Amino acid sequence: MSTDQSPCPSATGAELLPPPDGTLAIVPVGDIRLESGAVIPDVHLGVQRWGELSPGLDNVVLVEHALTGDSHVVGPADDVHQLPGWWNGMVGPGAPMDTDEWCVIATNVLGGCKGSTGPGSTAPDGKPWGSRFPAISIRDQVTAEAALFDRIGIHRLAAVVGGSMGGMRVLEWMVGAPERVAAALVLAVGARATADQIGTQTTQIAAITADPDWQGGDYHDTGRAPTTGMGIARRIAHLTYRTEDELDHRFANHAQDGEDPFDGGRWAVQSYLEHQAEKLCRRFDPATYVLLTEAMNRHDVGRGRGGVAAALAATPVPCVVGGVDSDRLYPLHTQQELADLLPGCARLEVVHSRDGHDGFLTETAAIGKLLVETMRLARAHR
């Protein structure tokens, strides 16, 4: 994959966007003022696009990625992205998000490590931001995305779609800027972080920051990174993404092939989790993992808006809310609350899966149907 150089900082309009073939561009969006009052100067976002803009700029669909995702929604692995697209089959000609009709845009989130300004980026003093990068919230991530669309001249999105941390951003778009969203798809997330989620996620953060190579978060120029800690964090997280039934069906209490757990060898499930950890450590910045996990802990659409019920009740955006029946990280009742409180939601759509939280990624046929329904709403309300 080629990567466009950053457009001229003074550029505005559609010329800021990358080509419609999935090429990654690094787009300047200006200074971003955070909820905390802090300002991150000269923010850039990694952006990919599939499909052409309509003359009226009214066909844009924003796809929001989850914690360790990025803007690479579809496409093969390449020199920029070590993995294929995380929603392959969902975008393209004739796909649920049909690029013969829609212009699909995805950003790498503020604080990310795939083209967007984050802890590993260069600060104004020429050194990595590291521990100096400000704490951010999900709302701050949406503020950065809104700044991108302001610069392009897109004032209303035909749809915003996403799951997990991406679903948090969808909700913040709906609640914080309903006039800018014609339709939405919210998957595998709740209105606020729960104690269980915060407990699991702070444990992952502790694993990373306890690694001696964390170095207070200022490791980027040292040649050492806290990959041992992040590997442990990923193993913890992955257990919450899957289910007891699925894991036991695949691995039971079997030893890894050719190894004996009674003689220092590994269990099959242990080997699987180590593999997941190693894959992440090759492609993801631990400081971004900590920063974004902290942002998820802060997720609460009701903060400063009179509580969850009041915030959702005041949100008129037509939407589809979906949940996975086996999800133990974001249980189905958290999506039921959204469906009950959002005026624009007709009912909760339940995805049946053995895969738990990851079902919003793996159950492509079911998710494709929800995307088709969301695009129908977008067509009717844009």
Curated annotation (Swiss-Prot):
It comes from the Bacteria. Substrate binds at residues 234, 358. The keyword Signal does not apply. Its main location: cytoplasm. It is found in: Cytoplasm. It catalyses: L-homoserine + acetyl-CoA = O-acetyl-L-homoserine + CoA. Homodimer. The active site is at residues 164, 327, 357. Residues 1-20 are annotated as: Disordered. This is Homoserine O-acetyltransferase. One of its GO terms (molecular function) is homoserine O-acetyltransferase activity. It comes from Nocardia farcinica (strain IFM 10152). Residues 59-363 form the AB hydrolase-1 domain. Its EC number is 2.3.1.31. Belongs to the AB hydrolase superfamily. MetX family. Transfers an acetyl group from acetyl-CoA to L-homoserine, forming acetyl-L-homoserine. InterPro entries: AB_hydrolase_1, AB_hydrolase_fold, HAT_MetX-like. Keywords: Acyltransferase, Amino-acid biosynthesis, Cytoplasm, Methionine biosynthesis, Transferase. Pathway: Amino-acid biosynthesis; L-methionine biosynthesis via de novo pathway; O-acetyl-L-homoserine from L-homoserine: step 1/1. GO terms for cellular component: cytoplasm. Pfam families: Abhydrolase_1. The keyword Cell membrane does not apply. NCBIfam families: homoserO_Ac_trn (TIGR01392), PRK00175.1 (NF001209). It is an enzyme of class 2 (transferase). GO terms for biological process: homoserine metabolic process; methionine biosynthetic process. PANTHER family: HOMOSERINE O-ACETYLTRANSFERASE.
